[in-house]
Amino acid sequence: MEMNLQFFSHHKGGGSTSNGRDSAGRRLGTKRADGQAAKAGMIIYRQRGTHIYPGVNVGRGNDDTLFALADGVVRFERKGRDKRQVSVYPVADAE
């Protein structure tokens, strides 16, 4: 009489998962707040797409970053009913 014994693992296999990764945050968002002074060239808002549109004295980079074109004070405003824009208004020199 011949016996055929098979021993099975008492621990399940390790398996695999498709999780376990994450990327660093992209540091998007407001860099200059409403009412803050900004010099020409300063970044005001970093974004992907146009959450906020450029207004007076504000330019838009090819990565949609908004930056000041002139020295002044930053103002976040409404553009129509459902859009927002940011402008930089020059301040008169007090002498």
From Swiss-Prot:
Primary gene name: rpmA
HAMAP family, per the entry: Ribosomal_bL27 (MF_00539)
Entries under PANTHER family matching the protein: LARGE RIBOSOMAL SUBUNIT PROTEIN BL27M, RIBOSOMAL PROTEIN L27
Swiss-Prot/TrEMBL GO biological process terms: translation
Family in the record: Belongs to the bacterial ribosomal protein bL27 family.
GO cellular component term, pick one: cytosolic large ribosomal subunit
The organism's taxonomic lineage, starting at the top: Bacteria, Bacillati, Bacillota, Bacilli, Lactobacillales
Keywords, ordered alphabetically: Ribonucleoprotein, Ribosomal protein
Region (Disordered): 1-34
The protein's name in its UniProt record: Large ribosomal subunit protein bL27
Pfam families noted in UniProt: Ribosomal_L27 (PF01016)
GO MF, any single term: structural constituent of ribosome
Post-translational modification: The N-terminus is cleaved by ribosomal processing cysteine protease Prp.
Propeptide regions on this chain: 1-8
